[in-house]
């Protein structure tokens, strides 16, 4: 008796995983009331690409504690916050911190997708992307669009 490889079952599982992905509009249902300025669908995709490139160069800060520590030290970059994080008290002080330090920040709809963009299986509620010459063009485009978003009052 030999083992039979389960290749057909794996491909079925992958197909099911693809069907479980939620659309941008479905993700908007779970947003917090403080999730402003919110990135558009196109900007969200650009940010994910920039984050993936930054991870390869190890130019990101991940998590509330680490991001807050380096913002207070004066590090510059784009702060990307997940709009579906609960309770909001976990990270509601970060936009104020960004405004004090003149850092651009933007909300995206899903913490799960934000974590996946970093190559992690865990959801992540905040990431700071630092500039680097390897992906400077992508970073500059994202920075320009994030700064063009209207800031909340």
From Swiss-Prot:
Modified residues annotated as Phosphoserine in this record: 19
Ranges that cross the membrane: none
Gene3D superfamilies: 3.30.1330.30
Cross-link (Glycyl lysine isopeptide (Lys-Gly) (interchain with G-Cter in SUMO2)): 3, 5
Cross-link Glycyl lysine isopeptide (Lys-Gly) (interchain with G-Cter in SUMO) per UniProt, renumbered positions: 5
Location within or outside the cell: Nucleus, Nucleolus; Nucleus, Cajal body
Cellular component aspect of the GO annotation: box H/ACA snoRNP complex; box H/ACA telomerase RNP complex; Cajal body; sno(s)RNA-containing ribonucleoprotein complex; telomerase holoenzyme complex
Entry GO MF terms: box H/ACA snoRNA binding; mRNA 3'-UTR binding; telomerase RNA binding; U3 snoRNA binding
GO biological process: one example: rRNA pseudouridine synthesis
Main location: nucleus
Record-listed cross-link Glycyl lysine isopeptide (Lys-Gly) (interchain with G-Cter in SUMO1), residues: 5
Keywords noted in UniProt: Isopeptide bond, Nucleus, Phosphoprotein, Ribonucleoprotein, Ribosome biogenesis, RNA-binding, rRNA processing, Ubl conjugation
A Pfam family that the UniProt record links to this protein: Ribosomal_L7Ae
Record text on subunit structure and interactions: Part of the H/ACA small nucleolar ribonucleoprotein (H/ACA snoRNP) complex, which contains NHP2/NOLA2, GAR1/NOLA1, NOP10/NOLA3, and DKC1/NOLA4, which is presumed to be the catalytic subunit. The complex contains a stable core formed by binding of one or two NOP10-DKC1 heterodimers to NHP2; GAR1 subsequently binds to this core via DKC1. The complex binds a box H/ACA small nucleolar RNA (snoRNA), which may target the specific site of modification within the RNA substrate. During assembly, the complex contains NAF1 instead of GAR1/NOLA1.
Family from the record: Belongs to the eukaryotic ribosomal protein eL8 family.
Function, in words: Required for ribosome biogenesis and telomere maintenance. Part of the H/ACA small nucleolar ribonucleoprotein (H/ACA snoRNP) complex, which catalyzes pseudouridylation of rRNA. This involves the isomerization of uridine such that the ribose is subsequently attached to C5, instead of the normal N1. Each rRNA can contain up to 100 pseudouridine ('psi') residues, which may serve to stabilize the conformation of rRNAs. May also be required for correct processing or intranuclear trafficking of TERC, the RNA component of the telomerase reverse transcriptase (TERT) holoenzyme.
Name the UniProt record assigns to this protein: H/ACA ribonucleoprotein complex subunit 2
Organism from which the protein derives: Mus musculus
